[in-house]
Amino acid sequence: MVHLTPEEKSAVTALWGKVNVDEVGGEALGRLLVVYPWTQRFFESFGDLSTPDAVMGNPKVKAHGKKVLGAFSDGLAHLDNLKGTFATLSELHCDKLHVDPENFRLLGNVLVCVLAHHFGKEFTPPVQAAYQKVVAGVANALAHKYH
């Protein structure tokens, strides 16, 4: 559960309505893989991830980034039940994929940076603070099965 004021919730949903999930998803996942290269080990089947250009241009990275942001969109629709919304994904990432839960926090922070880059002045400090709450809540929900 994420505790947002009505103003924060409105700001998050208003901005999210303008997000191009295809573009932002691929960019966020790509930047994660470039900035934190150890995360690439979970994506060995994606082919060439040898350079930043290869990562950012990789169609499998873009497609998976879109999928990730699709799940994030579902979370935004269920902010009062993030653990329930992400229970299946938490179980998958914990039991089958063995993803370090710290990676969820890292991806959330990268997503905030990508949103700031895309929206510039519209991504005000209050909007950023609200998004930081949301990505922290999503990361905690995804890490839930690890506890």
UniProtKB/Swiss-Prot annotation:
- Could you say which residues are annotated as the site Not glycated? 60, 83, 96
Modified residue annotations for N-pyruvate 2-iminyl-valine: 2
Outcome after substituting residue 23 to A: In G-Coushatta/G-Saskatoon/G-Taegu/Hsin Chu
Q: What is the effect of changing residue 122 to G?
A: In St Francis
Q: Write down the Pfam families for this protein, in alphabetical order.
A: Globin (PF00042)
Glycosylation positions in this chain:
2, 9, 18, 67, 121, 145
Q: What does this protein do?
A: Involved in oxygen transport from the lung to the various peripheral tissues.
What this protein is called in its record is Hemoglobin subunit beta
The source organism is: Homo sapiens
At the highest ranks, the source species' classification is: Eukaryota, Metazoa, Chordata, Craniata, Vertebrata
